[in-house]
Amino acid sequence: MKHTFIIFNFILFSLVSADCPDLTTESECNEWPQYCEWNEDTNQCQNIGGGGDGGGNGDADGPYEYMTITESQGLRNGPDYRDGVVYYPINGETPYKSIVLTPGFGGGSSEMAAWAEFYASHGFIAMRIGPNDEINDSHYQRGLGLIDAIESIKQENSRTGSPLNGLVDMDSFSVSGYSMGGGASHDAAMIDGSLKAIISLNPTVIFEDCDYCPLEGGYCICLVPEFVDHSVPSLIFAGEVELNELTAYEGMLGQDIYSNMPESTDKIMFEGANSGHGFAAYPSGEVSNYALNWLKYHILDDVDACESLL
């Protein structure tokens, strides 16, 4: 399945809210009553409604309510990423398939909260992470972070006291990211070819290597086809006019990643007409529908989901 889609009439939006699981005290939680509530049973701040038909911030529109696991509650703190939070569905179909999410340049773990809530509300374990250095970590380092986070999810399957003990599908892990994180998802695929799927949200990719790339402006950066030569099924969201915003990334955006990946790899590029670099940053409309159906098809073997991708 190798198709290019141009989708019209996107509505761009921004998400402005507190990310409740990051608030560690009841008093902090109560400062955001429109979004958050304190759970007396878990001593944790959580999103109001916790998912299930539009709970949380309104992006988690799936049928399941969800909860979170933070590092203060025993989640492993991996060396290759920072600020991991796991979201998991309540009373979903087990064992749970997992997806790990990482942000773009300058962003932290909380930037991916809306996507994590969305996937958890649809029955997946979703872990959001941030890079150790939001400015200086390379695409490759962020890819290592995605793989390291998978190890943290795996350890929840055997950790005493974890609500996910015995509930994790140990053979089904996918990765996703926005912008620089979207490019890092392909680094992760090169590191671990057993990944089930990739969802790249307005990805960028840079390889700094003077053996492969021409020296321009004091730097040797480019897209090296050999470094996206993997077979992991990939859904790539790209804005038609992204290059107008990111002129320095000519040849290194989603369209370029798609065209340089092997023809044998199952891949789709979803190009937003007249859209820029941020149109897939948050789950909404056609973007979230395609992302969810990509996972349903490649992870849950849902043939009907395949029809929705054509």
Spans of features found by a protein language model:
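Gly/Ser-rich "nucleophile elbow"/oxyanion-hole loop immediately N-terminal to the catalytic nucleophile
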Residues: 94, 140-183
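Short beta-strand element of the alpha/beta-hydrolase
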Residues: 95-104
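Short glycine-enriched nucleophile-adjacent loop
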Residues: 182-193
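Alpha/beta-hydrolase-fold serine-hydrolase catalytic core, especially in secreted/extracellular enzymes
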Residues: 264-265, 273-310
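Extracellular Cys-Trp
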Residues: 22, 31-40, 44-47
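Short amphipathic alpha-helix adjacent to the substrate-entry channel of hydrolases
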Residues: 110-129
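N-terminal cap/lid segment of alpha/beta-hydrolase-fold proteins
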Residues: 55-94
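The feature captures the conserved acid-bearing segment of alpha/beta-hydrolase catalytic domains
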Residues: 196-281
